[in-house]
């Protein structure tokens, strides 16, 4: 193991362990993080983080935040996080379909923005499940 990953939400420490590799969804695309990565502070988009430990991948849906990478320490502050293996597939699929419909029916700018955010969150939860299946 080469990286120390710590993921924190407002109400709890979500993850705190050594990892081999991390793949993050940033506002400018996905980035991979390995040992001795260049120091970086980046905004995280709503999406999935992939974490490799002992050659096995774990996924988690992250609902936006920030990541700081420095000296093999990765600290992630998120609004909310959910491990892929803890998400109910049926619930996630239903929520995804509902948010798709809401997005299509949105009329005002505010409704469109709110519907897009809800859709991105639902999509991230569904992707976190499908990546581990």
Swiss-Prot record:
Q: Where in the cell is it found?
A: Plastid, Chloroplast thylakoid membrane
Among SUPFAM superfamilies, the record links this protein to: Epsilon subunit of F1F0-ATP synthase N-terminal domain (SSF51344)
Highest taxon listed in the record's lineage: Eukaryota
Coarse class of the primary localization is plastid
UniProt cross-references to InterPro entries, sorted A to Z: ATP_synth_F1_dsu/esu (IPR001469), ATP_synth_F1_dsu/esu_N (IPR020546), ATP_synth_F1_esu_C (IPR020547), ATPsynth_dsu/esu_N (IPR036771)
The way this protein sits in the membrane is described as: Peripheral membrane protein
What GO MF terms are annotated? Answer: ATP binding; proton-transporting ATP synthase activity, rotational mechanism
Q: Which Pfam families match?
A: ATP-synt_DE (PF00401), ATP-synt_DE_N (PF02823)
- What is stated as this protein's family in its record? Belongs to the ATPase epsilon chain family.
- Protein name (record): ATP synthase epsilon chain, chloroplastic
């Amino acid at each position: 193991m080469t990286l120390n990953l710590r993921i924190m939400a407002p109400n709890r420490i979500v993850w705190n362990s050594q990892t081999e590799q991390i793949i993050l969804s940033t506002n400018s695309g996905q980035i991979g993080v390995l040992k001795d990565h260049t120091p970086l502070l980046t905004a995280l988009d709503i999406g999935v983080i992939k974490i490799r430990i002992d050659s096995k991948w774990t996924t988690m849906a992250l609902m936006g935040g920030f990541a700081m990478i420095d000296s093999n320490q990765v600290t992630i502050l998120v609004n909310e996080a959910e491990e892929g293996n803890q998400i109910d597939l049926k619930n996630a699929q239903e929520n995804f379909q509902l948010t798709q419909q809401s997005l299509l029916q949105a009329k005002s700018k505010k409704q469109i923005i709110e519907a897009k955010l809800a859709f991105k969150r639902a999509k991230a939860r569904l992707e976190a499940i499908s990546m581990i299946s």
